[in-house]
């Protein structure tokens, strides 16, 4: 993947993170009365419906768990918002990549106008009565289906999936993911890896290093040292470890000499007899 494409992915990732974190903070504050740096509300507000009261209880339990692990009120909210944004972004990015490989019908590329959602709506006309015409339900059905094989990312029981972007934020997020200059990236296997890396900005990494010369917690350890490994590096390492071992075991008589482009070998190499 060239530098220009990586730059586009980085910009989109940073924009998407900002969009989602702003949205989820506003939801925590305005809907659930959960504010960074302040004690958690003991009871859900009277303005919440039954489903929102359930979500409120789960949010409080999740934040209390973070508190028990050593986070203060501010850090607990910050951590939750970051993880919720990370999970939502990566799920929709994964759907874009599945679309590019024709493994799912178009579901994100045109938002609610996607052909996959249109077919889904045709099977359940009652969805038109929902505020978003059932688009969220459609995406969650896709998550549940994919979670059978990729549970670690798509499991909706994950506390990081308690919040969902409202209409305006979802439209903004989809617009970011569907930028024309980003279209080429979705067919690339490396894209999801670069999104993982760019979610933590270099400015954030530098700020951590200025505050402490060594990582102070598990997140800082990951942010400081977690870098995506490009395909060519993986291929070189694999070709010259496993590939090289097999090459020597077969005394050079193997198809790997043609298949492993990074395998270091000489045409006239000699091998000791077994």
Language model segments and positions:
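Preference for the N-terminal adenyl/adenosyl cofactor-binding alpha/beta module
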Residues: 1-274
């Amino acid at each position: 993947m060239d530098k220009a494409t990586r730059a586009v992915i980085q910009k989109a990732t940073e924009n998407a993170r900002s969009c989602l974190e702003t949205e989820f903070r506003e939801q925590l504050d305005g809907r659930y009365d959960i504010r960074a740096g302040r004690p958690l509300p003991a009871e859900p507000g009277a303005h919440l419906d039954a489903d929102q009261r359930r979500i409120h209880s789960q949010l409080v339990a999740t934040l209390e768990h973070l508190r028990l692990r050593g986070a203060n009120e501010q850090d607990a909210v910050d951590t939750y918002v970051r993880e919720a944004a990370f999970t939502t972004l990566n799920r929709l990015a994964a759907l874009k990549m599945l679309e590019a490989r024709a493994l799912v019908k178009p579901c994100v590329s045109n938002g609610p106008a996607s052909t996959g959602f249109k077919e889904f709506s045709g099977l359940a006309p009652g969805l038109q009565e929902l505020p978003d015409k059932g688009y969220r339900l459609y995406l969650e059905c896709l998550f549940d289906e994919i979670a059978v094989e990729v549970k670690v990312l798509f499991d909706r029981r994950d506390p990081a999936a308690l919040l969902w972007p409202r209409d305006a934020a979802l439209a903004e997020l989809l617009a970011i993911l569907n930028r024309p200059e980003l279209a080429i990236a979705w067919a690339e296997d490396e894209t999801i890896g670069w999104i993982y890396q760019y979610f933590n900005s270099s400015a954030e990494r530098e700020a951590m290093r200025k505050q402490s010369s060594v990582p102070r917690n598990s997140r800082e350890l990951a942010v400081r040292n977690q870098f995506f490994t490009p395909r060519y590096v993986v291929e070189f390492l694999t070709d010259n470890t496993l590939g090289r071992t097999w090459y020597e075991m077969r005394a050079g008589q193997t198809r790997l000499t043609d298949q492993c482009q990074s395998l270091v070998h000489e045409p006239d190499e000699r091998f000791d007899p077994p």
